[in-house]
UniProtKB/Swiss-Prot annotation:
Residues in Tudor domain copies: 729-787
Keyword flag Transferase: no
GO terms, biological process: miRNA catabolic process; mRNA catabolic process; regulation of cell cycle process; regulatory ncRNA-mediated gene silencing
Location, primary (coarse class): cytoplasm
Gene designation per UniProt: SND1
Summary of the function given for this chain in its UniProt record: Endonuclease that mediates miRNA decay of both protein-free and AGO2-loaded miRNAs. As part of its function in miRNA decay, regulates mRNAs involved in G1-to-S phase transition. Functions as a bridging factor between STAT6 and the basal transcription factor. Plays a role in PIM1 regulation of MYB activity. Functions as a transcriptional coactivator for STAT5.
Induction: Protein levels increased in response to lactogenic hormones during lactation and correlated with the induction of beta casein gene expression.
Quaternary structure, from the entry: Forms a ternary complex with STAT6 and POLR2A. Associates with the RNA-induced silencing complex (RISC). Interacts with the RISC components AGO2, FMR1 and TNRC6A. Interacts with GTF2E1 and GTF2E2. Interacts with PIM1. Interacts with STAT5. Interacts with SYT11 (via C2 2 domain); the interaction with SYT11 is direct.
Keywords: Acetylation, Cytoplasm, Endonuclease, Hydrolase, Isopeptide bond, Nuclease, Nucleus, Phosphoprotein, Repeat, Transcription, Transcription regulation, Ubl conjugation
Originating organism: Bos taurus
Protein name (Swiss-Prot/TrEMBL): Staphylococcal nuclease domain-containing protein 1
SUPFAM superfamilies (UniProt xref): Staphylococcal nuclease, Tudor/PWWP/MBT
């Protein structure tokens, strides 16, 4: 264990003691130490050396547990100062020693010198000189060593050092306390402030015996958050070390044994104190983990005051390098590519309360389970009626609340997914159903761990694992802390209150119940709903929160391709583009909040009507994307014109259901058009906005007072409860409130989100548009939504005129209209419908003059010649006005009739 050296001398002289070297591991008393060699492939051998020719006081000793009559032995005077003198001088230092005597029992006595040779400080002489030990009596006085010891002792006596000082030395006797009556109170009384201590014994790498100063409490301290391999006690009393137990113990011993440290007392467990040992050279807890000598333990990691993440990171460091206890470690995601371990995806569906379906950038769908959490579940076998089919979402307490929390937070949003582990498929057993392979991950949005948020609200619980089970969340400690908070605050599943009950009536396919509900739903107008399931492009299952019922809903006004169906004895194939239509509807509305208008029901008890998502009609959207055709029943609907316009646009693209469309000659429709008569029914309107393409927005004068009242009430409400700046996250198509340049709030709709600083909004009651930062936007209060008062600005275009395509000419026309009619009251008559918006004639309220005709007279626009019979009188008047403008060479006509030769060049069409 220790190197040796022979002192020089004649071959015939007396034998010179061999000089040996070692590192001082421990000081047993004022006259005995343990030295060790250098480690080579494992803990080194050890050896006890007793100092020759001197005697120091005996240290205190606790009575043996097996001897009930025995009593604790206290320190002898000056015994502890002698031990401390050697401890501070020798621990961890290299010494050399010579063995002078060895007893039959194996005890070795000799001289110890500090340093690499015998020229160093003689430890025995130093002890005697300090008055901490006495020279043994009866030794030969002519011995040179004895003579030096005698001189040292005389000097100590003369200087009254140590035991030669006045008094009996009782002040050097420690009042040792071996037990603590109330460990919890003892720990709390220190308020996690560092306590000075000496490590007296190392049981294993993570458990030590410490002497707390200055009150001399001798306590067992377990390192918080970790566990090292231990020594298993066998039946015969021997100890068998687990792999790396001896190495871990030596690692701690060589750094802490009999060192001055500070300990943060953090908690207690079975009379043992949990703590963190601080040493100037580092934190032993983290070092043990980093070197692969320890593993994290869940039951105590939460009390580690320096943050559980530091311990997990240190453990991860050792795992990645397969150090020591992790030599056979295989990472849970070792077989995954980096792009599959971490990715961004869009949430398309929430499955109950612990899983989501996401859409990857590749367009593929993937089910992700939230790592290490368990959704709410039924407790006990008798809680469910055997004859009643279980509906987990509504029948399991807090399942609905958990699903709703995830749905509102995640649906349609992009999230960050970090895969923690892959749970392999498992076969079914008598008690457990079969499970397919599961991808378990940590999902975050805006830096928030969704699983942690769910647990903190008491809407899920944390799964407990075996200590060696590494398949768990990478943020497992945060989950445990969140659960502890939820339990403490009595949240959700941990609440002492009665569990919430959701009595949801499922009237899907129940004709009798559907008939009873129909009048209520028809009278309700637009009702709020959540899309629970999408059967096909036009068939959905809805949850109506106000009515607390589930209904099957069919989209009105369209004919959507039918999907494949299982019929008795055969499978009916789906129509072309049925799957595309279903996917389109799923991506757009599944688990979204929508508005529905119920118009009727079919024989099977399914409701028929219109569904709106973010202000858009789903029937129109399906037609627009060539995934449905307009059904003849839509003619009676207010959305018929929008459907026709969408269908016409889809036909022109010749895609999907219109891929083989052949356009019919227009002439065939003309006789039908000629049968109509022009109706002139002018109504008063207020013009609020003129667009650059000469469209304009108006408000109905009859509902103007309603708008004024709503705006007044809304602004009062906002003044009382102002929106928190920056709290609103705008989404395209969403209604909101926006602060205009005048500092007032108005209703608006988000048209585009470029960035938080650039949000395009449309003021729905006035028709103007603006680009604003999101800090000037807020949530539209439900009391002032479009259900209470529809958007008041309606878009129109001038009938019978053709707007110049030349930018300067068009600007002249727009400027003229702005001067004449913006922010004034006019009279409006709808002449004909067209794609985009209705075309109208507009009259000045006072003179009844035709605004469009005035533009023609001034040569600012051209006439759009229409062939319908009912318009011929008006067209003639417009053409005569155009001829007058041409003759006078006004504006467009200043260079004559340019249309014959230069129409294409100047951007006009005749």
């Amino acid at each position: 264990m220790a190197s040796s050296a022979q002192s020089g001398g004649s071959s015939g002289g007396p034998a010179v003691p061999t000089v040996q070297r070692g590192i001082v591991k421990m000081v047993l008393s004022g006259c005995a130490i343990i030295v060790r060699g250098q480690p080579r492939g494992g803990p080194p051998p050890e050896r006890q050396i007793n100092l020759s020719n001197i005697r120091a006081g005996n240290l205190a000793r606790r009575a043996a547990v097996a001897q009930p009559d025995a009593k604790d032995t206290p320190d002898e005077p000056w015994a502890f100062p002698a031990r401390e003198f050697l401890r501070k001088k020798l621990i961890g230092k290299e010494v050399c020693f010579t063995i002078e005597n060895k007893t039959p029992q194996g005890r070795e006595y000799g001289m110890i010198y500090l340093g690499k040779d015998t020229n160093g400080e003689n430890i025995a002489e130093s002890l005697v000189a300090e008055g901490l030990a006495t020279r043994r009596e009866g030794m030969r006085a002519n011995n040179p060593e004895q003579n030096r010891l005698a001189e040292c002792e005389e000097q100590a006596k003369a200087s009254k050092k140590g035991m030669w000082s006045e008094g009996n030395g009782s002040h050097t006797i420690r009042d040792l306390k071996y037990t603590i009556e109330n460990p919890r109170h003892f720990v709390d009384s220190h308020h996690q402030k560092p306590v000075n201590a000496i490590i007296e014994h190392v049981r294993d790498g993570s458990v030590v015996r410490a002497l707390l100063l200055p009150d001399y409490y001798l306590v067992t301290v377990m390192l918080s958050g970790i566990k090292c391999p231990t020594f298993r006690r066998e039946a015969d009393g021997s100890e068998t070390p687990e792999p790396f137990a001896a190495e871990a113990k030596f690692f701690t011993e060589s750094r802490l044994l009999q060192r001055d440290v500070q300990i943060i007392l953090e908690s207690c467990h079975n009379q043992n104190i949990l703590g963190t040992i601080l040493h100037p050279n580092g934190n032993i807890t983290e070092l043990l983990l980093k070197e692969g000598f320890a593993r994290c333990v869940d039951w105590s990691i939460a009390v580690y005051t320096r943050g559980a993440e530091k311990l997990r990171a240190a453990e991860r460091f050792a795992k990645e390098r397969r150090l020591r206890i992790w030599r056979d470690y295989v990472a849970p995601t070792a077989n995954l590519d980096q792009k599959d371990k971490q990715f961004v995806a869009k949430v398309m569906q929430v499955l109950n309360a612990d899983a989501i379906v996401v859409k990857l950038n590749s367009g593929d769908y993937k089910t992700i389970h939230l790592s290490s959490i368990r959704p709410p579940r039924l407790e006990g076998e008798n809680t469910q009626d055997k004859n009643k089919k279980l509906r987990p979402l509504y029948d399991i307490p807090y399942m609905f609340e958990a699903r709703e929390f995830l749905r509102k937070k995640l649906i349609g949003k992009k999230v960050n997914v970090t895969v923690d582990y892959i749970r392999p498929a498992s076969p079914a057993t008598d008690t457990v159903p079969a499970f397919s392979e599961r991808t378990c991950a940590t999902v975050t949005i805006g830096g928030i761990n969704i699983a942690e948020a769910l647990v903190s609200k008491g809407l899920a619980t944390v799964i407990r694992y075996r200590q060696d089970d590494d398949q768990r969340s990478s943020h497992y400690d945060e989950l445990l802390a969140a659960e502890a908070r939820a339990i403490k605050n009595g949240k959700g599943l941990h609440s002492k209150k009665e569990v919430p009950i959701h009595r949801v009536a499922d009237i899907s396919g129940d004709t009798q119940k559907a008939k009873q509900f129909l009048p209520f739903l028809q009278r309700a107008g637009r009702s709020e709903a959540v899309v629970e399931y999408v059967f096909s492009g036009s068939r959905l299952k809805l949850y109506l929160p106000k009515e607390t019922c589930l209904i099957t809903f069919l989209l009105a006004g369209i004919e959507c391709p039918r999907g494949a169906r299982n019929l008795p004895g055969l499978v009916q194939e789906g129509e072309p583009f049925s799957e595309e239509a279903t996917l389109f509807t799923k991506e757009l509305v599944l688990q979204r909040e929508v508005e529905v208008e119920v118009e009727s029901m079919d024989k099977a008890g399914n409701f028929i009507g219109w569904l709106h998502i973010d202000g858009a009609n789903l029937s129109v959207l399906l037609v627009e994307h060539a995934l449905s055709k307009v059904h003849f029943t839509a003619e009676r609907s207010a959305y018929y014109k929008s459907l026709l316009s969408a269908e016409e646009a889809a036909k022109q693209k010749k895609e999907k259901v219109w891929a083989h469309y052949e356009e019919q000659p227009v002439e065939e429709l003309m006789p039908v058009l000629e049968e109509k008569e022009r109706s002139a029914s002018y109504k008063p309107v207020f013009v609020t906005e003129i667009t650059d393409d000469l469209h304009f927005y108006v408000q109905d004068v009859e509902t103007g007072t309603q708008l004024e009242k709503l705006m007044e009430n809304m602004r009062n409400d906002i003044a009382s409860h102002p929106p928190v700046e920056g709290s609103y996250a705008p989404r395209r198509g969403e209604f909101c409130i926006a602060k205009f340049v005048d500092g007032e709030w108005y209703r608006a709709r988000v048209e585009k989100v470029e960035s938080p600083a650039k949000v395009h909004v449309f003021y729905i009651d006035y028709g103007n548009r603006e680009i604003l930062p999101s800090t000037r936007l807020g949530t539209l209060p439900p009391a002032f939504s479009t259900r209470v008062l529809p958007a008041q600005a309606t878009e129109y275009a001038f009938a019978f005129i053709q707007v110049p395509q030349d930018e300067d000419a068009r600007t002249d026309a727009v400027d003229s209209v702005v001067r004449d009619i913006q922010n004034t009251q006019c009279l409006l008559n709808v002449e004909h419908l067209s794609a985009g918006c209705p075309h109208v004639t507009l009259q000045f309220a006072d003179s009844k003059g035709d605004v469009g005709l005035g533009l023609v007279k001034e040569g600012l626009v051209m006439v759009e010649v229409r062939k319908e019979k009912q318009f011929q009188k008006v067209i003639t008047e417009y053409l005569n006005a155009q001829e007058s403008a041409k003759s006078a060479r006004l504006n467009l006509w200043r260079y004559g009739d340019f249309r014959a030769d230069d129409a294409d060049e100047f951007g006009y069409s005749r």
